[in-house]
Amino acid sequence: MMPTPVILLKEGTDSSQGIPQLVSNISACQVIAEAVRTTLGPRGMDKLIVDGRGKATISNDGATILKLLDVVHPAAKTLVDIAKSQDAEVGDGTTSVTLLAAEFLKQVKPYVEEGLHPQIIIRAFRTATQLAVNKIKEIAVTVKKADKVEQRKLLEKCAMTALSSKLISQQKAFFAKMVVDAVMMLDDLLQLKMIGIKKVQGGALEDSQLVAGVAFKKTFSYAGFEMQPKKYHNPKIALLNVELELKAEKDNAEIRVHTVEDYQAIVDAEWNILYDKLEKIHHSGAKVVLSKLPIGDVATQYFADRDMFCAGRVPEEDLKRTMMACGGSIQTSVNALSADVLGRCQVFEETQIGGERYNFFTGCPKAKTCTFILRGGAEQFMEETERSLHDAIMIVRRAIKNDSVVAGGGAIEMELSKYLRDYSRTIPGKQQLLIGAYAKALEIIPRQLCDNAGFDATNILNKLRARHAQGGTWYGVDINNEDIADNFEAFVWEPAMVRINALTAASEAACLIVSVDETIKNPRSTVDAPTAAGRGRGRGRPH
């Protein structure tokens, strides 16, 4: 008698296992790498991605591109996640980490097809990664923090390396200096929140500026605003979460009115409530009043008569940055505006930038903060500039915390490749082949740099292998002269942390994908979502 089959999974569940599904997962990861392969390096191309809502994004940043791709393959999502983690951890090297992970998998694919056990591959990869990380730490060059001039030079070079593959690479010296200035203005915690980036359309990139303080766009203002002064020295700043508008209180109360005088008394009380608030603010000594909620026309004119400046509907993050920079605290009532809840700064002024007016707070005593004001033409271009600066800022922060650097341009990868290849020849068994495969995979970075620049990769890699075998540790691809060069001398520097993180993350992702032996996809729920309730009559949009 036939045994009854045990049905464990729901009908329609897609389950695949064994070597074919592992090979399929590896192939999916290679497809993801293909998407960002051409963006690597100073001659990398950009991608134009249009999302479901029709918003266009032009980007060269691996993490941004992978976030915008709607990846559904479960194994390929792992690569998207490591690119995101690299972006969050060190800010740069997102394309490199994706390429490395895909190349590690590509190199072990033949061994997987031949039936080599995944655990042997994972063991070899972990050994190779540990050796590579130790080697980076051993050969990385440490820059002395005590020498401020040297340290600044190092930081600028690291920022320029991060910016050289971006759209703004032509202005990398200009922006690298600004980025280093910005990070140097921060306190020891180097909080990213304390650097604001505002974009103003129009003008050239070189018109961008760095403000040593807080800056935000002038908010919507009512009549009477033009009478207010636009510049103060050492003002006190009131930060409020209070609505300063005339409110009809009859909406909030039920009142029986017998005479006209009673009604007049109610109207007078409404005015008095508002004037009472305004007087308290005036008596507190504040010269600049910022509120998250609207400040109406009556209040605007009241402040103008008393030489005070006000701005309502200030975005919350700008209000918080002003509070962190100028001191004080955001008040939800005006009843206790004492001196210790008011902020201070050296200069407040409103200035025209392009077609916009901006409010500037400079010389803030409390916390070090700064704001980039970016200029440029197309909106997409300015957004890409903002992403590029974010990468450079992250790199400079990392370089301050960990002061060891390595040479970029494929130099460190070639050196590690040579070191691991030599090591693999000293060990017996299957590990030798796998560590050799890991070493070969590292060459994808210089190879892709050559391919993206249109060079003969085979020729340049042969030269690099020969030079590294002779002891030229820092030799990498010279993009400008279609040759190889000592990239440490050429100041193509990046923090050792970037490379360590990239190698570790790529190796972990490769091990994770190799260790999966079965993929089970549950069927999509077939129950239709409940239809949206019909809109009220006369309110529905036309279908």
Swiss-Prot record:
Name positions with the PTM N-acetylmethionine: M1
For this record, an example GO cellular component is: extracellular exosome
- List the residue ranges forming a coiled coil, or say none: none
- Taxonomically, the superkingdom here is Eukaryota
Q: What is the effect of changing E379K?
A: Found in a patient with developmental delay, intellectual disability, pyramidal and cerebellar signs, cerebellar vermis hypoplasia and hypoplasia of the corpus callosum; uncertain significance
Keywords in alphabetical order, please.
Acetylation, ATP-binding, Chaperone, Cytoplasm, Hydrolase, Isopeptide bond, Methylation, Nucleotide-binding, Ubl conjugation
Question: Entry's PROSITE patterns?
Answer: TCP1_1, TCP1_2, TCP1_3
Q: Does the keyword ATP-binding apply?
A: yes
One GO biological process term: positive regulation of telomerase RNA localization to Cajal body
Q: Where is this region: Disordered?
A: 524-543
Chain residues that bind ATP? G41, G93, S96, R398, G409, R499
Q: What is its EC number?
A: 3.6.1.-
Q: Site of the Glycyl lysine isopeptide (Lys-Gly) (interchain with G-Cter in SUMO2) crosslink? A: K430
Its principal location? Answer: cytoplasm
**SUPFAM superfamilies, alphabetized:** GroEL apical domain-like (SSF52029), GroEL equatorial domain-like (SSF48592), GroEL-intermediate domain like (SSF54849)
Which chemical reaction does it catalyze? ATP + H2O = ADP + phosphate + H(+)
Give the modified residues of type Omega-N-methylarginine. Answer: R535
The protein's location, in the record's own words, is:
Cytoplasm
Which CDD domains does the annotation name? TCP1_eta
Recorded GO molecular functions are:
ATP binding; ATP hydrolysis activity; ATP-dependent protein folding chaperone; identical protein binding; protein folding chaperone; unfolded protein binding
Q: What's this protein's family per the entry? A: Belongs to the TCP-1 chaperonin family.
User: Can you state the subunit structure given in the record?
Assistant: Component of the chaperonin-containing T-complex (TRiC), a hexadecamer composed of two identical back-to-back stacked rings enclosing a protein folding chamber. Each ring is made up of eight different subunits: TCP1/CCT1, CCT2, CCT3, CCT4, CCT5, CCT6A/CCT6, CCT7, CCT8. Interacts with PACRG. Interacts with DLEC1.
Q: What is this protein called?
A: T-complex protein 1 subunit eta
Q: Which organism is it from?
A: Homo sapiens (Human)
Its lineage opens with: Eukaryota, Metazoa, Chordata, Craniata, Vertebrata
